[in-house]
C-alpha cells in the first residue's frame, strides 16, 4: 500500500483533483481544507475535545482508551459505513488527518478489517498545507497582468473567461466591495489560500502567466497571500472602461436580479426577501461614514423606496435611483483616484470587447 507521498506526489495528487477523505473533526476541517476533500470525521468536535482534555490531564494511553470508548458500537459502525461508501465512490482517494498520525491509521485499520485497502497521506493535512504555501510562493513569480476598471465593467467575467485567469473573488465567495458578499459563506483563510494554490497548480502546466482582477489587500474576510500581493504591486494593468449605462445593466443583473434569486432560493420567499433587503442595507451602512450622515440617510431612503417598488413590480431597475448617485459620488471617484496612482503600470485601456481582443492578441 502506498502510504508515503513525496512532495512531488502531493502536488500530483492536488493537481489531479484526487479525492481526500479527511477524518479530522469538523472544527479542524472548517479552519482549513483542500478543494477535493470531504469531511468524514473519526471523532466529532465534542469527542475530540474530550480526548484532548484527557490527553493533557492523564497522558496518551488514557486518551486513546477514551477515544475507543467514545467511538464504538453503533457510532463506530455508522462511521465505518460512511468511509466504506466514500472509498467505493472514490477508489483512487487517500485518507487524511491532521498530521498523518493515529486517526488516519485507525481509520485505515478499520477499513482493512472489512476488506478495504485504502492509502493515507503521510504528514496529513499539515503536509498538504505546507505544499500549497510553497506552490503559491513559487507560482506567483510568473508574470501577472491585472484587469482594472470601475465597478460594473465586467472585470470578474473577463478573468473567468481567460484560460490563464485566476478567479480570486470566486474562491473568496465575495466580490470585494461593501456589497460584495454572496449567499455562500466565505471560506476560512487557509481554505481560500488552498483553493487558490491548487487552481494555479492545475493551470501552471499550460500557461506561463496569470491574469487577475486588480484587488486590494483583502476580498471580504479573505486576505491575499503576501507573496501574491508583492507581485501584484508591480504588475502591468489593463483597464476596462465601458459606458455608464452598460455598467449599470451589469450591476442590475449581478447585484439585484441574481441576488434576489439566490437569497429566495436559499431561504425561501419570505426569509429570502428579508435577507436580500438586509444585504443591501448592510452594504450601504458599511460606507455611511464616507458618504456622510445626511447623504447616507438620503440614499437609504431611496433604497427603501426601491425595495418597496421591486416587491410590487419585480422590476430591479428601480434601484438605479440610489445606485447611480452612489457610483458617481463614491465608487467611481474612489477607483479613479486609486487608478491615478498606477498610471505608469497601465499598458492598455479599452471597452470590454477591446480588452478581450487585446488578451487574444497578446
Swiss-Prot record:
Gene3D superfamilies: Rhodanese-like domain. It catalyses: 5-methylaminomethyl-2-thiouridine(34) in tRNA + selenophosphate + (2E)-geranyl diphosphate + H2O + H(+) = 5-methylaminomethyl-2-selenouridine(34) in tRNA + (2E)-thiogeraniol + phosphate + diphosphate; 5-methylaminomethyl-2-thiouridine(34) in tRNA + (2E)-geranyl diphosphate = 5-methylaminomethyl-S-(2E)-geranyl-thiouridine(34) in tRNA + diphosphate; 5-methylaminomethyl-S-(2E)-geranyl-thiouridine(34) in tRNA + selenophosphate + H(+) = 5-methylaminomethyl-2-(Se-phospho)selenouridine(34) in tRNA + (2E)-thiogeraniol; 5-methylaminomethyl-2-(Se-phospho)selenouridine(34) in tRNA + H2O = 5-methylaminomethyl-2-selenouridine(34) in tRNA + phosphate. InterPro entries: P-loop_NTPase (IPR027417), Rhodanese-like_dom (IPR001763), Rhodanese-like_dom_sf (IPR036873), SelU (IPR017582). One of its GO terms (molecular function) is transferase activity, transferring alkyl or aryl (other than methyl) groups. Involved in the post-transcriptional modification of the uridine at the wobble position (U34) of tRNA(Lys), tRNA(Glu) and tRNA(Gln). Catalyzes the conversion of 2-thiouridine (S2U-RNA) to 2-selenouridine (Se2U-RNA). Acts in a two-step process involving geranylation of 2-thiouridine (S2U) to S-geranyl-2-thiouridine (geS2U) and subsequent selenation of the latter derivative to 2-selenouridine (Se2U) in the tRNA chain. This is tRNA 2-selenouridine synthase. Keywords: Selenium, Transferase. Belongs to the SelU family. Residues 14-137 form the Rhodanese domain. SMART domains: RHOD (SM00450). It comes from Proteus mirabilis (strain HI4320). Its EC number is 2.9.1.3. It is an enzyme of class 2 (transferase). Signal peptide: none annotated. Monomer. The active site is at 97 (s-selanylcysteine intermediate). The gene is selU. One of its GO terms (biological process) is tRNA wobble uridine modification. The keyword Transferase applies.
Amino acid at each position: 500500500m502506498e502510504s508515503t507521498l513525496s512532495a512531488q506526489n502531493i502536488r500530483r495528487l492536488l493537481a489531479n483533483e484526487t479525492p481526500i477523505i479527511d477524518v479530522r473533526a469538523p472544527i479542524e476541517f472548517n479552519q482549513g481544507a483542500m478543494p477535493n476533500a470531504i469531511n468524514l470525521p473519526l471523532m466529532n468536535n465534542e469527542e475530540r475535545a474530550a480526548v484532548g482534555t484527557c490527553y493533557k490531564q492523564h497522558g496518551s494511553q488514557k486518551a486513546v482508551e477514551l477515544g475507543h470508548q467514545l467511538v464504538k458500537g453503533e457510532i463506530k459502525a455508522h462511521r465505518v459505513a460512511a468511509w466504506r461508501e466514500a472509498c467505493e465512490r472514490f477508489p483512487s482517494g487517500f485518507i487524511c488527518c491532521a498530521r498523518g498520525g493515529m486517526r488516519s491509521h485507525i481509520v485505515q485499520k478499520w477499513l482493512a478489517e472489512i476488506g478495504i485497502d485504502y492509502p493515507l497521506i503521510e504528514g496529513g493535512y499539515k503536509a498538504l498545507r505546507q505544499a500549497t504555501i510553497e506552490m503559491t510562493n513559487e507560482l506567483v513569480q510568473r508574470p501577472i497582468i491585472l484587469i482594472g476598471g470601475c465597478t460594473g465593467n465586467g472585470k470578474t467575467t473577463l478573468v473567468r473567461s481567460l484560460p490563464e485567469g485566476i478567479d480570486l473573488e470566486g474562491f473568496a465567495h465575495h466580490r470585494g466591495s461593501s456589497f460584495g458578499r454572496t449567499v455562500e459563506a466565505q471560506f476560512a483563510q487557509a481554505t481560500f489560500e488552498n483553493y487558490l494554490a491548487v487552481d494555479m497548480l492545475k493551470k501552471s502546466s499550460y500557461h506561463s502567466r496569470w491574469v487577475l482582477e486588480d484587488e486590494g489587500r483583502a476580498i471580504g474576510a479573505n486576505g491575499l497571500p503576501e507573496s501574491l500581493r508583492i507581485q501584484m504591486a508591480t504588475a502591468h494593468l489593463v483597464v476596462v472602461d465601458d459606458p455608464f449605462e452598460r455598467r449599470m445593466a451589469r450591476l442590475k443583473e449581478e447585484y439585484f436580479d441574481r441576488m434576489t434569486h439566490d437569497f429566495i432560493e436559499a431561504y425561501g420567499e419570505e426569509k429570502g426577501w428579508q435577507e436580500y433587503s438586509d444585504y443591501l442595507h448592510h452594504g450601504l451602512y458599511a460606507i455611511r461614514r464616507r458618504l456622510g450622515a445626511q447623504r447616507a440617510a438620503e440614499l437609504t431612503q431611496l433604497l427603501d423606496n426601491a425595495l418597496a417598488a421591486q416587491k410590487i413590480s419585480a422590476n430591479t431597475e428601480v434601484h438605479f435611483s440610489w445606485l447611480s448617485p452612489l457610483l458617481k459620488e463614491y465608487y467611481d471617484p474612489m477607483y479613479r483616484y486609486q487608478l491615478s496612482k498606477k498610471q505608469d503600470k497601465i499598458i492598455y485601456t479599452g471597452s470590454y470587447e477591446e480588452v478581450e481582443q487585446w488578451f487574444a492578441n497578446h
